[in-house]
Regions:
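Short, small/polar-rich loop/turn modules that mediate ligand/substrate recognition or access, typified
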Residues: 1-44, 50-51, 98-100, 174-181
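Extracellular/periplasmic catalytic domains that process cell-envelope and extracellular macromolecules
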Residues: 33-34, 57-59, 85, 109-110, ...
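Structural recognition of the beta-strand scaffold that forms the well-ordered cores
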Residues: 41, 65-67, 91-95, 117-118, ...
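DNA replication sliding-clamp ring fold and its partner-interaction surfaces
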Residues: 52, 56-62, 165-167, 173
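Primarily the HKD phosphodiesterase
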Residues: 55-115
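Short, structured motif recognition centered on aromatic/hydrophobic residues
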Residues: 69, 129, 169
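Solvent-exposed loop/turn segments at secondary-structure junctions
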Residues: 70-74, 96-100, 122-125, 136-137, ...
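Signature of lipid phosphatidyltransferase scaffolds
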Residues: 136-181
């Protein structure tokens, strides 16, 4: 019984140490921001993530920051181009797989005069993020693809008016942009 108690105590201590190491880079917990709003989408059977994104892009006036693992959605790419055409500062970070992917929006976006860089440092740049006017953020499992909208079980989360969350995503976007080519 004593050996078992010592083993449990050791396991608890090891688990605590492991937990601290694992979560040391996580932001501290904080309450939702007063006045902030949150929207979610679940596809393929719930609210359209693609429509949510296109609407947010259409309402963007100053800056649009994008991080994408896979970006092949024609409606989303067209909305991004329209944003650029009306004077929005659009910048995009893509995973290296998008350089050779057959239907990637990378070439379309570059041809539209949009700054597109490739994040080659991690094994996979698996982010799916858009930051609109440094005021709202969309993130989730939703890749910016037709398959994500129509065939996959995906989710998205739009945070509007929570400056702390938006700032964290902008800071991360800037860091990924800094190390991309």
């Amino acid at each position: 019984a004593l050996a078992f108690s010592m083993s449990v105590a050791h396991a608890d201590s090891s688990l605590s140490t492991w937990s601290k190491q694992l979560f040391s880079r996580a932001a501290p917990a904080a309450p939702f921001a007063s006045g902030a709003s949150y929207r979610i989408c679940f596809v393929p059977n719930g609210a359209s993530c693609q429509d949510l994104l296109v609407n947010e892009i259409n309402n963007t006036r100053r800056t649009l920051l994008i991080q994408a693992y896979s970006f092949t959605s024609a409606p989303i790419a067209a909305a991004v181009k329209r944003a650029k055409d009306r004077g929005v500062d659009v910048r995009v970070i893509l995973d290296k797989s998008q350089v050779s992917q057959r239907y990637s929006s990378a070439t379309f976006l570059r041809n539209a005069g949009i700054a597109v860089v490739i994040d080659t440092k991690p094994a996979i740049a698996h982010n799916k993020v858009m930051v609109f006017d440094n005021a709202s953020v969309f993130t989730g499992s939703f890749n910016f693809t037709k398959s994500a909208q129509e065939r996959n079980a995906e989710n998205g989360f739009l945070v509007r008016g929570d400056d702390r969350i938006v700032r964290a995503y902008v800071d991360n976007w800037n860091e990924r942009f800094r190390v991309s080519t």
